[in-house]
């Protein structure tokens, strides 16, 4: 189990040193045949779990993700933070506790989720259009869209996504 972004390698484990390794999850001694090393700590395979879905990370893959004190499986990391963990508008990191807006798989800070034309913030319940990577409020959607020459990729009422499990 390797934490992406972590360059540390686990220290060698031998039969003589294994008896005193403690699990970072439960604090118990690790006497199992297999143990995991993630986030500079050793874990029982049953103790290294996703903070959201509680899946045992050793059983579902070879990597885990950490952010804001949470240990996450790949699916929950992408669901909560998008592929990059950064706002699609400003590029800045989004804290795990912050509410976000989403459009077509992109994640935005609330303050960055604005109309590309008038720069007014789009709020829950507003109708918007996502066209070629840009957000438009109902008033400022391109004339071609109104005339039916373009298809709106997103024109549903907007609901915020909360970064909690």
Curated annotation (Swiss-Prot):
Annotated signal sequence range: none
PROSITE patterns in UniProt: LIM_DOMAIN_1, LIM_DOMAIN_2
The entry's keywords: Developmental protein, Differentiation, Gastrulation, LIM domain, Metal-binding, Neurogenesis, Repeat, Transcription, Transcription regulation, Zinc
Pfam families referenced in this protein's UniProt entry, alphabetically: LIM
Domain LIM zinc-binding: 21-83, 85-147
GO molecular function: metal ion binding; transcription coregulator activity
One biological process term in Gene Ontology: negative regulation of neuron differentiation
PANTHER family listed in its UniProt record: LD11652P (PTHR45787), LIM DOMAIN TRANSCRIPTION FACTOR LMO4 (PTHR45787:SF5)
Protein name: LIM domain transcription factor LMO4.2
Organism: Xenopus tropicalis (Western clawed frog)
Organismal lineage: Eukaryota, Metazoa, Chordata, Craniata, Vertebrata
